[in-house]
């Protein structure tokens, strides 16, 4: 473009048009997984739904996928939101750094490790029995992302603590149990303590209806596929950007879980 052409052109309109086009492109790229069901609280701050956990799909062994990740904001203002390589049993730069902070013996370092600790999530297929906030979800199969508290209730149903309780596989179509998800807000956080399983019962009275549900389930292996994780070096680069390169602390000897676990890591 010559100077004369530049003078005649309406650069403002061009810039605005380009910016709008770019924003539209970015909006199209933003991804919302429509397969995921999410609970919603009512005006009182409570949530309620009845779900049925579903068994593993054909070709997979487990009815859940287990995923560790990190989500924290660094001093730069940037966020580090990444899946942790510890999910795959590999070394991860944030876990190594957190271990170094924890082992320093300095309380302020431990506080940093707590803020940066990895978080545990599970994914399972569910059938929505009842959802008063969104009745259009009832009778449909979704993926459900949940944490350790709900997983503990699943394990308690399979491994009851008392002699008068019968073990139940909540993922079984015929001998499983509906899960009454009850959410309250306690100290600003969602609390699931009131949630419980109903008495065991078949999902449906006929196998044809059960098979229709089974065919609609989603594979879970994708959540722990290697393609779902960045490499160690990529994560390290991102971590340095978020923390502005201010995080060299000692040698690494342990991994962080919900609380520190004294297990040796080879670096």
Please report, for each region that a protein language model flagged, where it lies by residue:
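Compact mixed alphabeta submodule
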Residues: 130-266
């Amino acid at each position: 473009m010559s100077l004369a052409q530049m003078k005649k052109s309406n650069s403002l309109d061009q810039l605005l048009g380009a910016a709008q086009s770019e924003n539209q492109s970015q909006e199209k790229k933003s991804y919302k997984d429509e397969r995921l069901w999410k609970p919603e609280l009512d005006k009182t701050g409570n949530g309620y739904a009845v779900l049925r956990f579903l068994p593993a799909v054909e070709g997979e062994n487990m009815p859940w996928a287990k995923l560790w990740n990190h989500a924290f904001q660094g001093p730069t203002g940037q966020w580090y939101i990444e899946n942790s390589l510890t999910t795959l049993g590999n070394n991860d730069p944030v876990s190594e750094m957190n271990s170094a902070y924890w082992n320093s013996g300095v309380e302020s370092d431990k506080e940093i490790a707590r803020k940066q600790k990895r978080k545990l999530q599970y994914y399972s297929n569910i059938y929505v029995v009842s959802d008063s906030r969104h009745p259009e979800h009832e009778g449909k199969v979704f993926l459900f992302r949940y944490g350790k508290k709900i997983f503990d209730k699943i394990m308690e149903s399979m491994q009851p603590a008392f002699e008068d309780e019968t073990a139940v596989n909540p993922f079984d179509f015929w001998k499983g149990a509906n899960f009454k998800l009850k959410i309250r807000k306690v100290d600003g956080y969602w609390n699931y303590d009131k949630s419980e399983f109903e008495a065991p019962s078949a999902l449906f009275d006929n196998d044809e209806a059960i098979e229709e549900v089974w065919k609609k389930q989603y594979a879970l292996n994708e959540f722990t596929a290697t393609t779902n994780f960045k490499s160690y070096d990529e994560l390290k680069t991102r971590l340095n950007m978020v923390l502005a390169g201010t995080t060299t602390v000692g040698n690494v000897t342990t991994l962080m879980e919900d609380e520190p676990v004294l297990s040796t890591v080879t670096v």
